[in-house]
């Protein structure tokens, strides 16, 4: 692997395998994000070539959490694709003269599912996470839109014995795209530990996306999303998150000082 610095010493260029498009890398505190014009296309090319991919959707909260949780930091750095999910990440880059489009993880996941529903080349997906009812409802909602979708599902409330059987199922079924929604940092650590079970698949941590797909919760109105205030709507829906939201001013302070 070859690393080169550009003139600003900010964006690193990495060679990629099999002549895939070369992603730029931008450092975010002790982590980094990959900068691509079309994340979905890049992922689908890798999937077509049988190259497994762990996708992390990075936001300010996860960045600060990774500083306090060495295992999470290691998992993020080991990921094949880290996308700028949060508005704080975009602000961090803009403060350093780099403009890039935000890539919300839920929208990336939805675009992958929609593509699978419209093509015969992706014939198997997997949802892992949520309550038993949520897992079923999320699958049902997507299959109502795309009846040909083949979705393997498992809720996130499983015992150790059930998890062993679930891993065996994954190994046997080999779903092509696996969405894991069991919360940060658990989902990133779980993917890093178990991605060898389906080595040619795309693995994506999707947080609470299953609740939204199942209709249990709503995404923020578009005007909040467009003004980088989606976090405030999540806090409104889940006031218990206020302690976790304390990482946002900490990230902003670090952004100004770094």
Which residue ranges define each predicted feature?
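A short helix->loop->beta-strand "cap" motif at the edges of active sites that frequently abuts
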Residues: 52, 122, 198-201
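Short, flexible loop segments at boundaries between secondary-structure elements
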Residues: 156-159, 201-237
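Conserved beta-alpha
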Residues: 90-169, 173-174
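Short glycine-rich anion-binding loops that position phosphate/pyrophosphate groups of nucleotides
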Residues: 59-63, 182-187, 209
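A transmembrane-helix-recognition feature enriched in membrane-embedded lipid enzymes
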Residues: 90-94, 219-258
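N-terminal nucleotide/polyanion-binding subdomain common to many enzyme families
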Residues: 12-107
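Proline-aspartate-enriched helix->loop->beta-strand connector
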Residues: 174-179, 184
């Amino acid at each position: 692997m070859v690393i080169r610095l550009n003139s600003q010493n900010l964006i690193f260029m990495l060679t990629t395998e099999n002549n895939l498009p070369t992603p730029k890398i931008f450092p975010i505190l002790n982590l980094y994000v990959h900068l691509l014009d079309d994340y979905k296309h890049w992922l689908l090319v890798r999937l077509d070539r049988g190259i497994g991919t762990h996708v992390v959707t990075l936001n300010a909260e996860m960045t600060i959490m990774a500083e306090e949780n060495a295992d999470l930091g290691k998992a993020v750095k080991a990921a094949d694709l880290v996308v700028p999910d949060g508005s704080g990440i975009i602000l961090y880059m803009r403060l350093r003269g780099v403009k890039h489009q935000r890539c919300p993880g839920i929208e990336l996941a939805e675009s992958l599912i929609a593509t699978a529903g419209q093509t015969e080349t992706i014939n198997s997906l997997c949802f892992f996470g949520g309550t038993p009812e949520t897992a079923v409802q999320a699958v049902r909602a997507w299959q109502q839109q795309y009846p040909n979708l083949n979705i393997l599902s498992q809720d996130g409330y499983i015992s150790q014995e059930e998890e062993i059987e679930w891993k065996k199922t994954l190994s046997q079924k080999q779903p092509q795209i696996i969405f894991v929604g069991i919360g940060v940092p658990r989902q990133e650590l779980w993917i890093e530990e178990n991605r060898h079970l389906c080595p040619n698949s795309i693995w994506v941590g999707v947080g609470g996306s299953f609740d939204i797909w199942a209709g249990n919760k709503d995404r923020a109105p578009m005007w909040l999303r467009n003004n980088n205030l989606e976090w405030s709507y999540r806090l409104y829906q889940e006031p218990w998150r206020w302690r976790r939201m304390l990482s946002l001013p900490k990230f902003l302070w670090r952004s100004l000082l770094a």
